[in-house]
Amino acid sequence: MGVLRYMKETGTTHEQLASVAVAQRKWSNKVPRAMMRDLITVDDVLNSRMICYPFHLLECCLVTDGGGALILTSAERANDFSKKPVYILGTGESVETPIVSQMYDMTYSTAFRVSSRQAFEEAGIKHKDVNHLMIYDAFAHLPIYGLEDLGFVKRGEAGAFIEEGNTSPGGKLPMDTSGGGLSYTHTGAYGMFLMQESIRQVRGEAAHQVPDVKVSFCQGVGGMFMAAGSLIFTNEPPHS
């Protein structure tokens, strides 16, 4: 209901919602590990089986097995490793309410807004400094909410922003470049894969690499979207 309310208030169309899945697939198309790689169109999405209105099958995350791991250590210790280290520039976390039914408004995520603001403040950077973005996408609306609640676009603008190709390969803000939960994988604890893709991008070793990524913003979500965590990664050592 929250998504339908958002669409009514902002004028976001079903075609724009479907564009999220189309954009993710353009990224996963060149990712060998991705579960779904064949390119799709908006019509393909809208003609796929309805799961729960307004979400069609291709607007819902995959169900897969999988796992991942990261090594977290000091910057000094990381210099001893064979691979170039990636640094955590900023962090943030927020829980709006313990029960999703108690959210003040389901047409946006207060937790997204709070956690991302904390991360930007800690990192000391602006939105224009971010080269790459990962937003948890269990369903197609979450990248739309994320773009707005993180402050990359204004409320009601995210659908058109994605539809116009701005988050797709060659766009001004590459997003969910592995294919995300809609096309790459979704094991239930998908946040691990968000972080891994951010790290691979800033290292320059991603399967579908974005040129010259120096800063990646990674946004996770929990409890529908009443809870959130934000991380900002960089390949340059933070100033002490």
Spans of features found by a protein language model:
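Glycine-rich, mobile lid/loop segments that gate access to catalytic sites or pores
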Residues: 1-54
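Short, well-ordered amphipathic alpha-helical segments that serve as non-catalytic structural scaffolds
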Residues: 2-3, 109-123, 197-202
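Phosphate/pyrophosphate-binding loops at sites that engage ATP/ADP/AMP, CoA/4′-phosphopantetheine
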Residues: 6-12, 116-129, 206
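Short acidic capping loops at alpha-helix termini that bridge into adjacent secondary structure
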Residues: 15-16, 126-131, 155
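Condensing-enzyme catalytic core mediating Claisen C-C bond formation in acyl metabolism
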Residues: 19, 50-114, 164-178, 182, ...
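Acyl-CoA/ACP chain-elongation machinery
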Residues: 21, 25-35, 96-100, 140-145, ...
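Active-site pocket-lining segment
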Residues: 134-181
